[in-house]
């Protein structure tokens, strides 16, 4: 069994492509792959978001606005995950499509519409997105990122605990690189950056990922 943790900026086009690559690999590979899309929110993510939108990095008002919006989208995603991984993943992908492709602005109405389209129990969802459990899940994700030394979105950590006693960190990867690593045709000691950590060391942290 392989475990893939993909750390994402929910509102970055590159991360959308990364998600597609992981989903494609899980479908194509003969190996059993368990994967998580872990939202990342830090100053690097915020500044890259501003840069991609052509906004000055010293525009503190816009930086704060982007930070709050990303935080809200992440809490929405975590709340959707409480109703199942597939529903949560579908919600995230639908929100990304609405905001990045259709250029819709984040709003309560958009969140409700997307949740309903993804067959999410709306009453439960609206309560959970403002609850402590969603905030705790967000904080757990950020701790996991810190423990794995993740500072940038579009980073994936791959564990094959049946064979190896370490995790492999891939940054800004493509489908071919990820597939080669998972299928064993890429030597992690020579071809990719390696994050030396035992599977046991992350056992507790893995439990935090929902």
Question: Language-model features: where?
Answer:
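Structural alpha/beta surface segment adjacent to cysteine/selenocysteine redox centers
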Residues: 17-103
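C-terminal cap of thioredoxin/glutaredoxin-like
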Residues: 5-11, 22-26, 102, 106-210
